[in-house]
Structure formats: C-alpha cells, structure tokens
Amino acid sequence: MAGARMKSFSNPDETRTPDKTLMELVDLGSVKAARLTVQPGWSWSSCIKPVVGTDTCQANHVGAVVSGRFHIKHNDGSEIDLGPGDAYVCEPGHDGWVVGDEPCVMLEFDATAAATYAKGE
C-alpha cells in the first residue's frame, strides 16, 4: 500500500443516515475517517441510542469541529462545549447534542469509532 493516501468525503466509501445525522466515511487502510453532520435538535440519546441500544455512547471520539456548536456530557460528570476549530477527545460513556440552530460538522479520526458509530448490530 502506498505511503501516502487520500480520499474525499465528497465520494465516501460508506454513508450512514440515522435521524438528523449524515455520517460520511472514508477508508484509508489502517484508519477510517468520518465527516459527521448533525442537525439542530440532534442528540445522541434521541437519534443514535435507538439504533445502537446502549444507555450512553460507547464510542471513543477523536476529532475536530468544523462548524456549529456541540455539547458533551460524560458519565463522570465532566462537560465540554465545542465550537469551530476545537479539537476533542471523548471517551466511552457520554451523551452529546447540537447547541443552537445551525448544523454541527465534525471530523473524526478514531478508526474504531468511525467504523462502528451509528451502526446497529
């Protein structure tokens, strides 16, 4: 495999569309990357929980916000507000939701999260 690879989110390898969600995935070999666009009114508990069936999100997220605003509340009590330009890590055991009236666009680079997020059994 080539030492340098690229793919475009404009032509994703896979697309997932749970309620108020557009997840576009590209497979770069050892890494899967995702562009996640979530609409106003989106929350993990209302839009993704019905798909995956767990009490909280069990994915590990590593990414950055491109546009919009997002709030994360972790089971350990920690909470963060994210906006454009913010990089984040969020460990399993959390809920999250869009803040405000514009979509939130995030790029994620954790291979496991990108491969399994918003995907039913």
Model-flagged regions — what are they?
Residues 20, 41, 77-79:
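Detector for glycine-centered tight turns/loop "hinges" at secondary-structure junctions
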Residues 50-76:
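Glycine- and acidic-residue-biased ligand/ion/polar-headgroup-sensing regions
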Residues 43-44, 68-73, 96:
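Short beta-strand segments in beta-sandwich/barrel cores
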Residues 74-94:
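Short acidic-glycine-tyrosine-enriched beta hairpin
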Residues 35-36, 89-90, 95, 100-119:
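A short hydrophobic beta-strand segment most commonly corresponding to one strand
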Residues 1-37, 45-46, 121:
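A short, N-terminal "cap"/entry segment at the start of jelly-roll beta-barrel domains
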